[in-house]
Amino acid sequence: SNPDNFFVQVIEINLDTLEPHIVGPHTPDLARPVSRLKEDAIDNSYPLQISSALIGSCTNSSYEDIGRAAYIAREAAKKGLKSKVPLMVTPGSEITRATIERDGYLRDLEAIGATVLANACGPCIGQWKRDDIEPGESNSIVSSYNRNFPARNDGNKETLSFIGSPETVIGLALGG
């Protein structure tokens, strides 16, 4: 078959050259490959250590999203790894929470130290007990949410919030 007969334009992408991206802080428009994150953090004086990792809420919180994160958690647990930072997972619905519990994903996430929260806006809109930093203290967090504006996630304008996929968030939580 000849794609040119059916499409105005054919775009070929070499999937071997793609890598996960992370955006932020303070805007979803500031994107970079994960491999550039440390360099950008140093160049911009971002805190290098992640203080919290957050998955779910209304975005990236489906059964499939959490399942992919749970798979990484399961493999990490087999190697004795744990999250180095507080890791919170918010399923997108009560049905999703019940299904991840039924299928063992909840157990996989908890095995690396994750806390699975009730379905709610929660940390995405700053509804969590954030007592690991002082008000006004500069820190970096990573989430799979779709909002990362200043003070959005914890009321602290000095929190630098980065956004990645659930898999990227799990990886960064394991690395700290």
Language-model region placement:
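Fe-S-dependent hydro-lyases/dehydratases of central metabolism
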Residues: 1-176
